[in-house]
Amino acid sequence: MRTVRLTKESTKDILENLLKRSPNNYGKFEAAVANILANVKEKGDEALFSYTKEFDKVEVIPETIRVTEAEIEEAYKAVDASLLEVIRKALVNIRSYHEKQRQNSWFTSTEKGTMLGQKVTPLNRVGVYVPGGKAVYPSSVLMNIVPAKVAGVPHIVMTTPPGKDGKVNPSTLVAAKEAGADEIYKVGGAQAIGALAYGTASIPKVDKIVGPGNIFVALAKKAVYGHVSIDSIAGPSEILVLADETANAHYVAADLLSQAEHDEMASAILITTSTELAQNVEKEIEGYLKVLSRKEIIEKSLENFGYILIAEDMDEAIEAANEIASEHMEIVTKNAFEVMMKVRNAGAIFIGEYSSEPLGDYFAGPNHVLPTNGTAKFFSALSVDDFIKKSSIVYYSRSALQEIHKDIIQFASSEQLTAHANSIAVRFEEEDKKEQP
């Protein structure tokens, strides 16, 4: 982990290093992904089943690709009762938070005979991708499905790669059932994204695809964007801790490592005004590394994308934090809420020493699907808004349109769009003729 004096130049260098992790820098995989998508689009289930056999070493057929109720019942028996209780507790918090994001249609009218409004409609069908492999993330299942359910999406289709035994991890299935998935399919990778985007005989086409995945999934989502909507192109996990001399080095080090353990591309950054804290955090990290299970991954992550930045004052620290625009930000300072108000760019902000980032990953309620790679400057956390669309509503009575029709005709004529002007003019030809001298 590198300790650096904070300057505009050092901030720029760090940003350039972090952006190397972007999926945009994996062009060598794009041809393979494009080929998979093209085959799924053209051959449907045939390609889907073939890729599942090739990549996951599992044979699926139309009768086995969809998870059955019997398989879900079996999953409930396999999941520890205490974990099920925790999943249900987390669901209560996640639903409660997202219900506050609901938007209603609205309409406003005038005595002149006009009505304007906005009609809010949930998307019809959403695809949720859930990664498989050794790591299992039922929390991601909850975070991707719940806002769609709260938004009112009537059809939620989940795909996840099967294990070598042809089954889906029990905790993944239980989380999906609890959250409200309507259909679950045993297929993963770029081929699953293709199936959701284009539809096959077994898997229905969706309107939007959400959920994290490996580089092949990320590139596939990027490729189908426009044909369907997507949530984002997720990058490696990020944490930035903004701290002063009041922070507890033992806690700060633990929080930095909580994200560094995700993978070797994860970034962990401390920006502090205290050199003493910086030194103590380094010592604490060394101590933790002796006992943590994912030591090798953490060491690689910290070597490549770990930084301790020493700032002259808190204003300089905040400025750098806004420039980096981290996925997760913790504020452990005096007057932390005042500092929070100065933060413009962060996916999620955790305030105080007892608001550790994993609290947001699992339990607090806000969504843990967050913008990465500096995109927190213009993107937000996954929310109910991502699963609705808004239609503008316009109603004018004849008298209301007549009052302003000449203004519209003049505007359209100034743009030389005579058909636009005519569309208004034909409705008042008789009246306008009478007005002519």
Where are these regions (language model features)?
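Short internal beta-strands
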Residues: 154-164, 268-274, 281, 352
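C-terminal core of ALDH-fold dehydrogenases
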Residues: 322-437
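Conserved NAD(P)+-binding/catalytic subdomain of aldehyde/semialdehyde dehydrogenases
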Residues: 180-258, 262-267
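Conserved small-residue-rich beta-alpha loop and adjacent elements
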Residues: 108-174
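N-terminal Rossmann-like NAD(P)+-binding subdomain of aldehyde/semialdehyde dehydrogenases
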Residues: 1-124
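Alpha-helix C-terminal capping segments
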Residues: 143-154, 177-179, 197-203, 221-223, ...
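A glycine- and small/hydrophobic-rich beta-loop-beta segment
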Residues: 262, 270-346
